[in-house]
Amino acid sequence: MTLRRRHVFITGGTGYIGRALIDALLSRGHIVRALVRSGGSARLPPGVEYIVGNALDATSYASEVAPADTLVQLVGTPHPGPGKTEQFRRVDLPSGLAAVDAALKGKVRHLVYVSVAQPAPVMKSYILARSAVETRIREACGQSWLTATILRPWYVVGPGHSWPVVLKPLYSLARKLPWTRDGARRLGLVTHEQMIGALVEAIEHPPDDVTGPRVWEVPRIAQGRAP
């Protein structure tokens, strides 16, 4: 089956996930435009179009989203942790809400949002910010033509993000115990390769249902393979 060539607008394209995703999309023949801050274009992979704007303010870039059919929101606090509540409030929440507004104003058909696995016993403020964006996405899908895919990883293991590997034996044990099995699956680790594969799949195969977003939890993300 011949895949349709997608026109993808990405916020957060210079980050841990963004650069690799752009490379993967370009290699598969898709058109990619990335939002960057002033002076940030040097960190983008070659071959990508870019515009300068503020990811926290939809009015700074919404007019540049068209003719994209897909908007991918990847902006967030680097290396999120329990002590970064203020950053989640100032960056993760407004950037997510701005992406929804930009998608609507740009008449994008499909919004792809990377949220976080939930519920969880820690990272409450991070989950709160991401959940608020999910709520806004559901509202937008219910009131417009917009479709959405929400991916909920817990931790993406890859270059510079590998410390949770030491927890793998504990995850293996937790998956075997009935009372911890569901939580271990929901809060499991995914690799950087799996995350990029899942994002590419989501972009290339948008949902048909316009009544609400589809949600991919950790087990579904883990099925992703490098393009």
Predicted regions and their residues:
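NAD(P)H-binding glycine-rich loop region in Rossmannoid oxidoreductase-like domains
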Residues: 40-98, 102-105, 203
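N-terminal Rossmann NAD(P)H-binding glycine-rich loop of SDR-like oxidoreductase domains
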Residues: 4-28
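Alpha-helical substrate-binding/gating segment
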Residues: 189-227
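Flexible, glycine-rich beta-alpha linker
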Residues: 149-178
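A conserved pocket-lining segment of Rossmann-fold NAD(P)-dependent short-chain dehydrogenase/reductase
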Residues: 172-190
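Substrate-positioning beta->alpha
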Residues: 91, 95-96, 165, 186-201
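Conserved Rossmann-fold NAD(P)-dependent oxidoreductase catalytic core, especially the SDR/UDP-sugar
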Residues: 31, 39, 77-135, 140-149
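Structural motif
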Residues: 7, 69-70, 110
